[in-house]
Amino acid sequence: MLPITDRLLHLLGLEKTAFRIYAVSTLLLFLLFFLFRLLLRFLRLCRSFYITCRRLRCFPQPPRRNWLLGHLGMYLPNEAGLQDEKKVLDNMHHVLLVWMGPVLPLLVLVHPDYIKPLLGASAAIAPKDDLFYGFLKPWLGDGLLLSKGDKWSRHRRLLTPAFHFDILKPYMKIFNQSADIMHAKWRHLAEGSAVSLDMFEHISLMTLDSLQKCVFSYNSNCQEKMSDYISAIIELSALSVRRQYRLHHYLDFIYYRSADGRRFRQACDMVHHFTTEVIQERRRALRQQGAEAWLKAKQGKTLDFIDVLLLARDEDGKELSDEDIRAEADTFMFEGHDTTSSGISWMLFNLAKYPEYQEKCREEIQEVMKGRELEELEWDDLTQLPFTTMCIKESLRQYPPVTLVSRQCTEDIKLPDGRIIPKGIICLVSIYGTHHNPTVWPDSKVYNPYRFDPDNPQQRSPLAYVPFSAGPRNCIGQSFAMAELRVVVALTLLRFRLSVDRTRKVRRKPELILRTENGLWLKVEPLPPRA
């Protein structure tokens, strides 16, 4: 009998019997074994952490706040934080180490040669990490943004045809119509003179309007009256951002008992219900009519995103499930509206700030539209806007909608200088940092569209400019986004003169996308109708 057994029985007030002595002794042995295993595991973790720390010593790091907080709270998601980050990048041009508290190291990569091994790696070697993207999982499921391994590869293969030029061309009419609705609102608000408007507010609704038509063939009139579905998407984006900055909400069992967590769940249910209803109704029609008759009935109409996914098949004829299609549709709605609205808003801001470039873009667009009765851009017109495209690219360099992407290494990754990123480390590929790296982009603060002049190509790495990421996990919808960007910018310049509202200071705010702290206000002045 263990000496402690007799004492334990006495403390519990239990009579000594052979069975009780045996049972308590066995229980204590199991408890000791469990504690030993726990201690062993803890020691292994400590040893692994120590080895990782030693391997990370070769990477430079900015001064920490202290040993406990590390760099936590030093680079806040606001204008001051971006300026502090720029000061660091002026001295550390390739890769740097930051500590989120005492035990979570992150490597930040800010140079084309150093982001190449990460962005070029397969989804199995450098998948999206769960720490930064996990909050979106209940909303977006296993769509392209969050899925991994074979599932990601299969979905990427099946979704690629949805972004073929032949599918995108009919969307041009939708882009034109959505821009027309927004511009009609602007004219009404301006009443013939200049009016100050928040670009993010108006353009975000416009991109959501376009996306609902492109994804679901559904006209919600959300630019005129907010729908429950659109309200839910906007709320989900805001709640996801808020959760990132509340450490106690990182734990699901706490978050979903909070007011924010309950609202997040309700908004998810709303979005999922809408998407699922559309998919099921469309699938029933497809099965009843058959693919050939169903496609024939679609002639003359735009084939939307849901249609393409319902028709998608593997080599063996296997189709995507309703859940798979829902995840991809929700992902496209999330990724497509915020990023594009950010890109358009910052582009219009730059043209308002530099009227000489605005006027040159306007002249280019007027030349393309000369002799037309309708102010409507067609697919082939997009290639006739070289200077406008240069301005868009420079704006995406200076103000990338997505400022960083994160990856978690599942194996050691070697950098160009021979240093090794240890397995298990989370790496932040800083798109903003790369686009503002002074060794890659001289005078990076200056807005200069001629950096992208095709007649004067610069000797730069293809990875110096990555607003849509790069490699196997690059943005599948970048052609869609660039088409919408050019249409909306072109029609806006054709109809309005833009200027900066000097009474409202622009202060950047990197969240899920690059926003501003108090809106992006521009003065919008209607131009007289074309002769």
UniProtKB/Swiss-Prot annotation:
GO molecular function, one term: iron ion binding
Subcellular localization, as worded in the UniProt entry: Endoplasmic reticulum membrane; Microsome membrane
GO cellular component, one term: endoplasmic reticulum membrane
Positions on the Lumenal side per record topology: 1-22
Ranges in coiled-coil conformation: none
Main location class: endoplasmic reticulum
Topological region Cytoplasmic: 44-531
Disease: Ichthyosis, congenital, autosomal recessive 5: A form of autosomal recessive congenital ichthyosis, a disorder of keratinization with abnormal differentiation and desquamation of the epidermis, resulting in abnormal skin scaling over the whole body. The main skin phenotypes are lamellar ichthyosis (LI) and non-bullous congenital ichthyosiform erythroderma (NCIE), although phenotypic overlap within the same patient or among patients from the same family can occur.
Function: A cytochrome P450 monooxygenase involved in epidermal ceramide biosynthesis. Hydroxylates the terminal carbon (omega-hydroxylation) of ultra-long-chain fatty acyls (C28-C36) prior to ceramide synthesis. Contributes to the synthesis of three classes of omega-hydroxy-ultra-long chain fatty acylceramides having sphingosine, 6-hydroxysphingosine and phytosphingosine bases, all major lipid components that underlie the permeability barrier of the stratum corneum.
Name of the protein this chain belongs to: Ultra-long-chain fatty acid omega-hydroxylase
Organism in which the protein naturally occurs: Homo sapiens (Human)
